[in-house]
């Protein structure tokens, strides 16, 4: 353990917080657990080999003691995470109060860089007007903690900063008692879900982030953005450049439980949350604006609103703003009632607003009147925040994307063709498919007939598109704007979706020209698909019909890039380089056809699924690939870590905006040496494929990781694998990466790198020099190495060897693990060599410190997991062993702070 890293004076408060929480947890353990468990946990905190200690102690523990020890280790990881989060916020505030300027990734610093880069106000305004940044919340099942447990953690996080402000022993004792009480509740709450989450559960979890965080964070962030820009560019106005999007309730790729009903449920929940927020803000505004016409002038349009008010109290006759607000609230709540939401309004209900824009227009009348008549401060406070909120959230709160596998779309098209007496669609070649689809897309005549009985699949798919059309009509055009084609491989995949949109009334054809209400978004996710992305899109851009469709959508084409499957296919190095090359090619292609590009990055939380710091990731994109337009998926434990707290949410969203603007306005960057990167990719790919195609590899993976137990964890509504667990390609990327995180190999994020560097540099010092230069100066290569460094710091080859002992074929496992161990040695050596350092994380003290705090408990959980997996494999029906495995999976995920 690198305990010396905690001796920095800047970390004194962190050390005190950690000690305070640990003492509370020990108080709890003394009351709730046996002395042997308490003593073991104390020994773990100073042990250099936690797993060995666990192996020694475990035979002395009964089932209850084993359970308590496992739970205690997981709780220690949780409370240390909380202490870390509080410390990050503390250091940020100290930094700001010291007036040291903005940190990297802040808008303050970005605006300074724009000015230093000679960007003038007009060019900045032009870029802002063409900027769209969206964080898209998905239901990918990587959040191992229950919402109940997360709520306990948030309560501790809110209380902990009070420790520094306690001025006497009594205050500290009261704080201690509050935290002890929460920890007791946490101890006595089940850590694991007993039942599988439903899609509706996932929807509710996603919605809960908004009142918890986003409703506060987004308006505040916009206010800060306006301030930062106006300090340097006084005439710049900040449009709605940042939004939150979602997939939860509309993503049916591999999830048979997503339906038209779940889509409708999602928007009802969205609307319920956002209208409750609006009602609360209008009520506060009503109390804030008792301005009297005896004291202020009021614009005529506000007086007109007041005249229509249902608030007829005598005391309000001289308070036109309050009366106008009552009118606005009654109309807004009238809309809520029209949408079927069961919420009341103290002023009754008036004619519903037809659109969020009407609601916005009335609020702006209040603002204009306040500014015109000397009340600017009131106009720029809560009212301005509410105006921004309505303009961002509308009546739908967040837009949802639709997503489905290309093959599922094709099956619906084939059945429509069959019943219409047309060609056997699935037997046609690609050229023929394009021809028949374009024929059917050249006119408005539908293929669907209400008098024909279609398969459940076809009815299910068309019902979702029809529901999306109704939702757009009711909640606003922005409620559903994207339909994503996963596993997109051919131009016909895009045209097939277009046909389904036409059949559902979401795409109209007039005089042969299409007009679509939804963006058609291809998702290229495998290595082969990424390499084929440009030919597919060039074929589309050459079609006059598709050109007209793009014109109806503002001449913007969104492309989604999948990080997960490409990594599983080819390893981290090859995946990263293929993605970069695909983006380079797409930039040139879009320029050639004068189409604006928006890239949607399907990244996970872990490096093996494209994760890593967002700021560096965006700046590492090829020049021209961002251009103000970017969407990024956020999922599972990442949503909790980044967005469950308003302060965290504000900073993480600010980072996305800052990086997007820097990458767009200051894109002066050199691409990496293509020949060098291709060579690195080719050799890395060769070694990675040698491993995963080894005949004994799949059995090794299934037996030496908790992959099969993860499938029973009830993390999400979607099945863990597409078919069976017999082939790597049938396994979803999330449990694939999740499992390698659990057994501490993190293999998808580095395997093949070391052999590639060694092969290329052997006898070739110029190549080593070139790679070192790239490591120092090229954003793409720097980001790749930085992510790899973070993962390798969490890798523990000794612990991983314990997992290898779970194999049912020791001789075969010895060969596979030998390959992995040797590649780890090479990759670590190569990484240190290119970074020109002797230790990992030398320049990332924050992560090194964080790991040092948690590693004793994390390693202990791994030791417990190996022992419990061994027991479970011998006794498959042992419920205690399965529960312990589940608890250790939870604990390890918390200790690592990312999963999949």
From Swiss-Prot:
Gene3D superfamilies: Phosphoenolpyruvate/pyruvate domain. Its cofactor is Mg(2+). Its EC number is 4.1.1.31. Keywords: Carbon dioxide fixation, Lyase, Magnesium. SUPFAM superfamilies: Phosphoenolpyruvate/pyruvate domain. Coiled coil: none annotated. GO terms for molecular function: magnesium ion binding; phosphoenolpyruvate carboxylase activity. It catalyses: oxaloacetate + phosphate = phosphoenolpyruvate + hydrogencarbonate. Pfam families: PEPcase. PROSITE patterns: PEPCASE_1 (PS00781), PEPCASE_2 (PS00393). NCBIfam families: PRK00009.1. Forms oxaloacetate, a four-carbon dicarboxylic acid source for the tricarboxylic acid cycle. Belongs to the PEPCase type 1 family. This is Phosphoenolpyruvate carboxylase. It comes from Neisseria meningitidis serogroup C / serotype 2a (strain ATCC 700532 / DSM 15464 / FAM18).
